[in-house]
């Protein structure tokens, strides 16, 4: 396959992966279970599928170093809390609002990463942080946690903080493993973390709900991670980051088409501000990582 053909294939895989990632939000509304129970069953199914993918691709399930199991445990705990808060945010508010609140994470990454790397924080990053804060404020209907939408926004921001922490820790300590290996351990640990807290009665779950759970665990969890990993072979990190910023748009469009969710003007403006800032920071971060041709 030519380089142009590889890039086209990678871009198709990437957009499909981001579309599927955006589609996960719909299941917070479609599956009649709590956020914790949805996450638990999602992780059970995804862990099984990911283990099979690792074996079929002839990779090792065993980790290289003993200390990596402790890192996998920490990452799994963070992922379990991230996914529970991710679904809870949308159950409390709406798919669009929950996803916009969650998508504050690219700017959070820019603001928090210097603490991990010792790099300098730029003025533009602080301005981006203020822009995202303004965007989130526009989403809030009233400054009271008694309002479910306001609470959902707060929970979505907590989910973004957890996701940011997971990404930074993974980047620093767990990059020796493929996406399938890493996600297998994170979903498997999440099952162990969440299992004691579930309120499931398996016998009461309908066949339709089981079908939705299988769809979520296989098509909307394992498959997009595999597609995303494949796309990384053909595309630059900048392209991947910029396309990933379309996730809230895809999620909101799917919610509008399939769930008949509508956007208020304030939500549309706030969401545009958050996503535009995420796009800007993603673009700038990759520019800063590029080799400098002329420093004079």
Per-range role (PLM):
Residues 98-104, 170-189, 221-257:
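Helix-helix packing/entry segments at the starts of transmembrane helices
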Residues 50, 54, 73, 121-141, ...:
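Hydrophobic transmembrane alpha-helices of multi-pass small-molecule transport proteins
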Residues 37, 44-48, 87-118, 159, ...:
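Specific alpha-helical transmembrane segments that line the substrate/conduction pathway
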Residues 9-19, 60-85, 127, 150-159, ...:
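Loop-to-transmembrane-helix transition segments
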Residues 33-81, 106-109, 162-169, 183-201, ...:
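Transmembrane alpha-helices of multi-pass small-molecule transport proteins
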